[in-house]
Amino acid sequence: KLHPGIKNERVHFILLPVCIIFVSVMEKFELHILGCGSALPTTRHFATSQVVNLRDKLFMIDCGEGAQMQLRKSRLKFSRLNHIFISHLHGDHCFGLMGLISTFGLLGRTAELHIHSPKGLEELFSPLLAFFCKNMSYQVVFHEFDTKEPVLIYEDRSMTVTTIPLQHRIPCCGFLFAEKPRPNHIIREMIDFYQVPVYELNRI
């Protein structure tokens, strides 16, 4: 059941540890599970992290310890990752951030890295960035939000990302990835003029 603030639209959904992603049907959609473990490390599971590939734009959801190692194994291009979404401030969902941020700096990244999270992450990470990541070639931009209500936290010309309030021991949310409706490319007058059969319209 969707939160009352989320429109009840037709979407596919994927259940992940703590985080729930809803996505509409898109031209290209890939989900890479980098880690699905809990707080205690094991030899078989990395801590929680997923990467969504939407039309070759990469969006990371949570960044547990070891996320960047798994990112390399998945052969995903670091340069296409510009937005990271953190569901809540437990360590197994964000301990991998510092290593990833540092690696981006060593690789000579220049594009901004946007980190979206519940309130409190910037306060936690700012001293670490100031100590370990001085004079980086790029800027880390924090975007903090309230998890009590759905909030639009990302938008481009083809899609939006909205938070979904979730119940957990601390403030927590999932993320709704939704494709924007495309403009109608069928001109009714031309359909009538050329008498295009209805069964052919789906192919246009």
Question: What role is predicted for each listed range?
Answer:
Residues 4, 10-11:
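N-terminal amphipathic/hydrophobic targeting modules at extreme N-termini
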Residues 12-23:
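Hydrophobic alpha-helical signal peptides and transmembrane signal-/tail-anchor segments
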Residues 21, 26-74, 112, 175-177, ...:
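Conserved beta-strand hairpin/beta-sheet module of binuclear metal-dependent hydrolase folds
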Residues 31, 140-142, 161:
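Generic structural signal for residues in well-ordered beta-strands
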Residues 65-116, 144-146:
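Active-site metal-binding motif and surrounding structural segment of the metallo-beta-lactamase
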Residues 76-79, 138, 157-159:
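Structured loop/turn residues at beta-strand edges in well-structured enzyme cores
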Residues 109-113, 118-146:
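Active-site neighborhood of divalent metal-dependent phosphoester bond hydrolases
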Residues 146-204:
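Metal-dependent phosphodiesterase/nuclease catalytic metal-binding core
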